[in-house]
């Protein structure tokens, strides 16, 4: 099945054509326009600017995707689009673009959950991956643990109660003077630092829960930096990055371990923008190897927002009988 997919949930505009089947998961084209340089000026994503940039980019990306794939709109069999969750103005652009294409060419339309699409990115890197599995989705806007019983059956068993893990990285990076987005630079600095030099709290919430809270961890790091500045103390940025990274990764891996015990799953999927973090990939790999679990990580180039993952999940939504019509509306929340 040839699927046209659209992604515009935050600040990346993406259009892809994927071919999906019982034994086929293939990306024919995936064109993405990043707004990072624009939002870097403001230290974070400005929703109104993001939605306007989506409008400017989406049509040309669609043309480019068709050119690269060597096919025409008439050949498309399904249109999939991220409809929730995300920035409402950004989602609005992608949803209406997808609805217009579906209407103009008489194609079926499928709405896709953005966090489910991130997990689906792992299918593209692991052709034999099938549910059930435990999915850890970690990004700048979302952090959740889901028991994936089937391709479209997700049960969230743990999530952040406040900031997402990626948001904590970005906000600490900003205080450290690192331009947005700071996650990648924090990852590099952490490789050069000593995680034992500073103690920061865990993000795992105490009690009978798999939830996390990154707000307290973020505040603890920022307070450390501000106190050091007021005292005139020297701050070793590499050590701060290393200690922060260890707190984040160890908290996430701890929750994965607890979730595995509760669900009995033997396969773990790691996806989302923060899934590109080298320390998280290494620590989770070590844990899974030690405990005899299979780990399927989304390919690094598909960890960020992209339409290929949306098209992949759209295929399974379609097979499950999930359809949308022209009344489809974007939603900021799940």
Regions found by a protein language model. Give the residues of each.
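Short Gly/Thr/Asp-enriched flexible loops that form oxyanion-binding sites at enzyme active sites
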Residues: 81-105, 278-287
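Conserved phosphate-binding catalytic cores of ATP/NTP-utilizing and phosphoryl-transfer enzymes
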Residues: 111-134, 313
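Glycine-rich phosphate-binding/hydrolytic loop that grips phosphoryl groups
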Residues: 120, 298-334
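Conserved phosphate-binding/catalytic loops in two-lobed NTP-binding clefts
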Residues: 111-112, 268, 284-309
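Short beta-strand scaffold segments in enzyme catalytic cores
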Residues: 13-19, 135-137, 143-147
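N-terminal beta-alpha supersecondary unit
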Residues: 2-85, 96, 114
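Glycine-rich phosphate-binding loop plus the immediately following alpha-helix
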Residues: 127, 150-194, 218-219, 223-228, ...
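A contiguous, well-structured pocket-lining segment that forms one wall/lid of small-molecule binding clefts
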Residues: 30, 188-268, 277-287, 291, ...
